[in-house]
């Protein structure tokens, strides 16, 4: 793979540089300005939290946003199916009906021609629906922890008839579930409870991390996102490293970093919905061999929370933990309300007023 940047990546890089320049120049101007840093490993749900802030604290998605997300939904949907098709070979799973091989070829051809952002033709849509209904494909989908698959694969593939309709327009939930890798730093502004928030979403993949630390010394609080459901999966960028272990290592390095000694840390144990389903079938010992408790949502989630809290080496630093589902607007609204109250209390305490 060459080093040529796409127009989109160049734009992201320019935007990132501009934000970094502004960060260096301005510092927090007053207690009413809240600078929040959103951190976490890749695919922990950070960008979904940003989209929720747009829904909750701004005016939601504009007509232009909807238009821009439409090709992303098409791409996420067909790329998810193509990933399952490729895994059929890798895992040696047979199709329920051998005729599905022709459908699989059609899907992979569209992806290889980079036509994955186009609306589905009637022929392609039928092929995709037949594939998704195939017993072999379903068996392969159920083994998705053994390969890399978008968390929203089932959501989109269950909605093929709706997404494939000629008059399709993405819904709020469709947009929330889109997956686009974040490169560089993305800044979002909004006002809530008389506070002016500046929320910074930073790319989570390893290659992005060196861009983080230097410009965020004066941050008010860090929201650290963890995908609870990653306990039985490996990383995209390193298929020997467990995702939960990576998150724990990253949390350790952020929590105990000299830049963040006095910074409040809010831990979002995210994707609780996926975790609740997964823990019934996939034991926590995959990630934590020493775990002896029951494989129930409550016990396993509490154990994971304790693992993160144990990384905090500062007796004066409190970790504020919330179980979240970033695609659930009501859940994020309630949690963010609580987070804001923590920030206000800490601000008052800092001024000697609390």
Curated annotation (Swiss-Prot):
Residues 174-182 are annotated as: G2 motif. The modification 5-glutamyl histamine is found at residue 205. Changing residue 40 to R: In DEE17 and NEDIM. PROSITE patterns: G_ALPHA. One of its GO terms (molecular function) is mu-type opioid receptor binding. Residues 197-206 are annotated as: G3 motif. Mg(2+) binds at residues 47, 182. This is Guanine nucleotide-binding protein G(o) subunit alpha. It comes from Homo sapiens (Human). The lineage of its organism: Eukaryota, Metazoa, Chordata, Craniata, Vertebrata. The gene is GNAO1.
């Amino acid at each position: 793979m060459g080093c040529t940047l796409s127009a989109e990546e160049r734009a992201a890089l320019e935007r990132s540089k501009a934000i970094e320049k502004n960060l260096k120049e301005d510092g927090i101007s007053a207690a009413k300005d809240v600078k929040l840093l959103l951190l976490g490993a890749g695919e922990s749900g950070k960008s979904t939290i940003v989209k929720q802030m747009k829904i909750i604290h701004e005016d939601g998605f504009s007509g232009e946003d909807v238009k821009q997300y439409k090709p992303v939904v098409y791409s996420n949907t067909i790329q998810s199916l193509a990933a399952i098709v490729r895994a059929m070979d890798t895992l040696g799973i047979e199709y329920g009906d051998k005729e599905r091989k022709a459908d699989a070829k059609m899907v992979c051809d569209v992806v290889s021609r980079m036509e994955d952002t186009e609306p589905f033709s009637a022929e392609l849509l039928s092929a995709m629906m037949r594939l998704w209904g195939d017993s072999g494909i379903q068996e392969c989908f159920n083994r998705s922890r053994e390969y890399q698959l978008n968390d929203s694969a089932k959501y989109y593939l269950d909605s093929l008839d709706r997404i494939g309709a000629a008059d399709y327009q993405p819904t709020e939930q469709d947009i929330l579930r889109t997956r686009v890798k974040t490169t560089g730093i993305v800044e979002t502004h909004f006002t809530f409870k008389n506070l002016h928030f500046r929320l910074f979403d930073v790319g989570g993949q390893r290659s992005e991390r060196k861009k983080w630390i230097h410009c965020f010394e004066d941050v008010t609080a860090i929201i650290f996102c963890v995908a609870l459901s990653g306990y039985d999966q490996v990383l995209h960028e390193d298929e020997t490293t467990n995702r939960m272990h990576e998150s724990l290592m990253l949390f350790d390095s952020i929590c105990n970093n000299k830049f963040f000694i006095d910074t409040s840390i809010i831990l979002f144990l995210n994707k609780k919905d996926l975790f609740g389903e997964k823990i019934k079938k996939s034991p926590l010992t995959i990630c934590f061999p020493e775990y002896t408790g029951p494989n129930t949502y409550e016990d396993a989630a509490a154990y994971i929370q304790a693992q993160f809290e144990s990384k905090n080496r500062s007796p004066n630093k409190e970790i504020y933990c919330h179980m979240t589902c970033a695609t659930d607007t009501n859940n994020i609204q309630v949690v963010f309300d609580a987070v804001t109250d923590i920030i206000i209390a800490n601000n008052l305490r800092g001024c000697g007023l609390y």
